[in-house]
Amino acid sequence: LTKKLFAACAVAGLILCLAGSTLAYDKITEGEPGEKIERSLAVDPQAVVTLCVASGTLKVRGWEKSEIRVRSLDAVQIDFRRIDRTKDTSKPATRVDVMLIEKGTASHPRHDCQALANVEMEVPAGAIVQAQTRDGDIFIAGVAGAYAGSQNGDITIERVAKLVEAGSVGGSITLRDSSGRVNLNSAGGGVEVFNVQPATEDDTFEVGTVSGDIQLNRVSTPNVNAKTVSGTLMMSGPLAKSGNYGFTSMSGDMVLVMPSDASFKLNAKVSERHSIVSDFQLKFLNEPAAPPTPPAKKAPEAKSTKPIDKEKDKTPKAGPIVAPIVIGRPAVVAPYALRRITAVCGSGDATISVASFGGTVRLKKI
């Protein structure tokens, strides 16, 4: 599971890589030291805009104009690179990379995400934004799509209409008031989500962390998949009709808070040492205590060593041969380390699949 989560973070990073190599530089705008420089460019209302720096805070907002405007106090030059490969450069750009040259490096400019600068940018509300920084926070609001990646900073995304993908290694991720397909991954930080709904019936919601907590509040997407290694996983809000929810945790607790009239089918795999605590009246469809019985029958194999007690005095070398038996016992017990529970609440409209290997699962009423 850990490898999968790190792989997911790596995938999110790859998505943010700058694409294309065809250069179409517009004229250069330079600023004096201490002066905030600003630059604009006409673009298609649904343009794809990429902004990337090595370090710095990035703030991106959508507006009603069909142009992008970039401002920075830390850069002396802002450069727009068209990568739409159009033959007619008089038409508004459909794909643009925003490049910055920081103060002190004008004589030896560093392109391709090497600038150290804080940046503010406005883009058309229908645009898709790709923002990336190694050390810094990212804020994106009011656009059609958002791809965001930060190694050590926090990511905040609001009011996105169609899709969101965000990944952070050491920072937290917050998503509010958005719709569409969602994929969020953080290795060391937590993930908080508020008011997210699908834009189409095929939209999915996926979130994963390694050590950070996951909090999902009022997520109405019908297909939800949340995974964490050691964080606490919490979901609060009504279930989508005929929704499918998957929750996996290695060592953290799970808390699912739902309305009192929630209707769902529960498919759970939980550790024998932990339990499911429910405020809801559950109708169990199988007997959870049955699986642990086979190990009790397997234990008498130890009797086979008693007749050999007389042999032990003659052959003390037999001791090491017993060791593999100790190793072999977990192989018999392992299949029953998790209890499989199937239960129904109400008419079972939604499906909740839970896998908890070391924490308690709580089903609470709002």
Regions inferred by a protein language model and the residue ranges of each:
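Intrinsically disordered, low-complexity terminal regions
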Residues: 1-366
